[in-house]
Amino acid sequence: QRQMCIRDRPTKPLVLALDGRCGSGKTTLANTLARQFPASITLHTDDFYLPPAQRIRGWEKTPCANMDLDRLRDEALRPAYEGQPVQYRAYSCREGAYLPARELAAQPLVILEGSYSHHPLLTGCETLRVFLTCAKEEQTRRLQAREGERYANFAARWVPLEEGYFAQYHIAETADFVVDTTQGGTI
């Protein structure tokens, strides 16, 4: 099974994968942890979108079809898990281009943050999997505040894809911890 103690891995970093519903506080928690543990690096799944030309036809209806999880695993997550430096180029959807290379030194804590961070393609490169959730009403409130006028499109497109991914791969059920942030305010 996946049971493993930190003491069993003295030469490798702790890799904490934070997945969960949009608006549940994944990025906020990752940022808080990074501040609390300066000897850490944070990898964002949002840095690994596929350029539109590389996406499969009908990607809008297929969970995770807009993500380059192979590249995330091979260029960033696996080296970080092995205690090696990481170098990768994030893809910016806003700019429609890859950004300059990011270089991250090996650290004892690696925070993998974002939707799809518990995807089966990434299994084996994490130590601890945490799923964040919140009540639907709270998710709506948070997303409206975050997305503003883009909320309707966001809710119609991304929320169903995410929920499909959770159901298909039993993401909450296979997490080591499930954290409900409904009462957490802005976490």
Name these PLM-found stretches.
Residues A97, H119, E149-I187:
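Small-molecule kinase domains that catalyze NTP-dependent phosphoryl transfer to phosphate-bearing small molecules
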Residues Q1-I6:
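Short, small-residue-biased leader/transition segments that mark boundaries at the very start
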Residues K26:
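Conserved lysine of the Walker
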Residues A39-A53:
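Short beta-strand-centered segment that lines the nucleotide-binding/catalytic pocket of NTP-utilizing
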Residues Q54-G96, L109:
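Conserved nucleotide-sensing/catalytic segment adjacent to the nucleotide-binding pocket
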Residues A97-R146:
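ATP-dependent NMP and nucleoside kinases share a basic, alpha-helical "lid"
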Residues L29:
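Hydrophobic positions on the alpha1 helix immediately C-terminal to the Walker A/P-loop
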Residues R21:
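P-loop (Walker A) phosphate-binding loop of NTP-binding proteins
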